[in-house]
Amino acid sequence: MKFEPKTLDFDLSPYTGLTRESWLEAGRYLLEGIFQNIDDFQKPVVMPRKETEITYPHLKDSQEAQAVQRTAEVFEGLTRSFFIAAPMIGNLPDLTVCGYPMAEYYKNQVLRVCTRGDALYVGTYEDQQEITGHTDPYRTFQQTVETCALVICLWVSKKQIWDTYTQAEKDVIAGFLESYAHASTVPQNWRLFNMLDMAFLHMEGYPIQKDIMRDHAQAILAYYAGDGWYRDGHSFDYYK
């Protein structure tokens, strides 16, 4: 079923008619599409797969590679859906979708993926290196990307989720984030992921390695090509 906004105001929004309420309706529509596939509050956001050749986990890869990919699958499902849920929660703190209170669901899932020993624990950077046998000391992992998504969402829904954790729970999440924030990253726009991790930790009173932050910052400035465009290897990215 396609999305059809119920609220339109062409005086306020002459081209599309879409208003703030329209976007909240769109967010609910997208979340319902996700959560109709989640049959238990404790289960992660892992969508049904149509293929196994292109998207990970790649079933033909080694067991070690699949182990890393499966945790990335859980983490990416959480954080990318959180991109939709976080602003929705910020605007509608009591939002419930498919019977699940969104703030409670994401609060629970975020803590679980960061907690060692939990069935959903996705592992620190050091854990990923251990799984892959330390074959490359500078290896990067998809989880670095997702930590950036996580801190953005925690900031957007700060009052509803982050501020409701106990100090001990915050410390668990911060320790998890710190492992990726200061670890190896791809020497292009991935540097921004590490920077945002460190920025969140710093704003929340956790120590960061400022020399690493400065190094990432000077590199990002060197990538800038003007008018919002940044070099990304042989390509360009636009950031507004």
Model-derived features: where do they sit?
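Aromatic-lined, polymer-binding surfaces characteristic
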Residues: 74-75, 85-88, 99-240
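Extreme N-terminal leader/anchor segments
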Residues: 1-115
